[in-house]
Swiss-Prot record:
It comes from Mischocyttarus phthisicus. Keywords: Amidation, G-protein coupled receptor impairing toxin, Mast cell degranulation, Membrane, Secreted, Target cell membrane, Target membrane, Toxin. GO terms for cellular component: extracellular region; membrane; other organism cell membrane. Its main location: secreted. Most of synthetic analogs show a decreased antimicrobial and hemolytic activity. Pfam families: Mastoparan_2. This is Mastoparan MP. The modification Leucine amide is found at L14. Expressed by the venom gland. The keyword Membrane applies.
Length: 14
């Protein structure tokens, strides 16, 4: 799992 990509996606969702 790519945490950097996942974190960025979650940040964009907020």
């Amino acid at each position: 799992i790519n945490w950097l990509k996942l974190g960025k996606k979650m940040m964009s969702a907020l």
